[in-house]
């Protein structure tokens, strides 16, 4: 409950922050989220019982939910074209490397006192001070207006039909949400099931933490070169990374050696590391300048939905195939799912969801 409740609260508040960003001051929403984040971290240091700790972590989930879409949405407000794509890639990379560093730091702090890991939650205080400078800069709305609000297409009728999402190409955004949800779900088997696999095959249990860290470091790398990757792969920018994820999961499933498992984690991470910033960039392009943060919020919410549902989906599917309790079956199952996604991605590689973004926009 202590770990799942914040994630559960993040989803509705990501969506709420996205909706509020359309008509409210984005910086005020960001400041509020960062302040709640810091306050919850501060009071966690003094929590004496589990009930109070759960309540404080719920506040943390609310604050995180408000910060997540705004931190990326402000990039879309201030940059355009290929430079925006590059900045979104860097943002994705920073998120993943921070996750690795924060996990390592909290593990060390926990050896001193169980309260000390909550010190990490005070870091948004630094971000809060830095974001105060954003009040001095306003995005060039004239430049932003050069981005097509919603490309003229047969989906315009669908856009008009969804009254609560004006200014967003809903069919394209839904396609991106589905792609992101499935891609996130299939790779989460690494973080959720790898420790059980290594324990089952009497491999070093301590090495599983290293493998998972390697996985997140691999996710970080493509974001640093995302525009170069898109230009090189062109319309293969989605289905080739999906094939990499499939190859990584199969390496983990087929070869039970620590070095092959590590390689599998790295390969799968590289594949997902291309898809994540690419989906963010395409999501921005489905909306006009007023609704970019809302579009990002909708897409980002499915990431946390996948995190919440992954264990239940894995249990359901392994049960249907009569493999309940299997340590390695989830890897081959998800490899099959992502292979099917890659086939679809190749078939529709010229489409908006599976194709490469146009940097001329």
What are these regions (language model features)?
Residues 28-42, 236-251:
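Structural signature of the two symmetry-related core transmembrane helices
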Residues 11-50:
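Conserved MFS/SLC helix-loop-helix module at the cytosolic interface between two early adjacent transmembrane helices
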Residues 12-25, 221-234, 318:
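Helix-to-loop junctions at the C-terminal end of transmembrane segments
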């Amino acid at each position: 409950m202590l770990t799942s409740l914040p994630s559960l609260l993040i989803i509705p508040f990501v969506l709420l922050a996205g909706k509020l960003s359309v008509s409210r001051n984005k910086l005020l929403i960001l400041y509020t989220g960062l302040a709640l984040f810091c306050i919850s971290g501060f009071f966690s240091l003094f929590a004496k019982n589990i009930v109070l700790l759960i309540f404080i972590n719920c506040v943390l989930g609310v604050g995180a939910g408000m910060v997540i879409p705004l931190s990326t949405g402000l990039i879309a407000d201030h940059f355009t074209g290929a430079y925006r794509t590059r900045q979104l890639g860097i943002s994705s990379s920073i998120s993943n490397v921070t996750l690795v560093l924060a996990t390592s730091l909290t593990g060390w702090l926990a050896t001193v006192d169980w309260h000390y890991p909550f010190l990490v939650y005070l870091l948004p205080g630094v971000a809060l001070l830095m974001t105060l400078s954003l009040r001095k800069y306003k995005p060039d709305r004239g430049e932003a207006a050069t981005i097509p609000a919603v490309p003229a297409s047969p989906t315009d009728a669908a856009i008009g039909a969804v009254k609560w999402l004006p200014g967003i190409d809903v069919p394209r955004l839904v396609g991106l949400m589905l792609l992101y949800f499935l891609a996130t779900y299939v790779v989460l088997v690494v973080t959720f099931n790898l420790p059980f696999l290594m324990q089952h095959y009497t491999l070093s249990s301590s090495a599983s933490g290293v493998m998972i860290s390697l996985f997140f470091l691999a996710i970080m790398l493509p974001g640093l070169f995302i525009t170069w990757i898109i230009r090189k792969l062109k319309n293969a920018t989605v289905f080739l990374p999906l094939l990499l994820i499939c190859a990584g999961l199969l390496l983990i499933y087929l070869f039970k050696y620590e070095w092959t498992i590590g390689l599998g984690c790295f390969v799968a991470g590289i594949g997902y590391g291309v898809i994540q910033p690419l989906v963010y960039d395409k999501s921005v392009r489905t909306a006009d300048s007023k609704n970019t943060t809302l579009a990002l919020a909708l897409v980002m919410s499915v990431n946390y939905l996948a995190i919440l549902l992954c264990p239940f989906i894995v249990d359901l599917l392994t049960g249907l195939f009569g493999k309940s309790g299997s340590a390695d079956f989830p890897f081959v199952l998800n490899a099959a799912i992502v292979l099917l996604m890659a086939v679809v991605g190749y078939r529709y590689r010229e489409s908006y969801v599976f194709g490469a973004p146009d940097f001329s926009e």
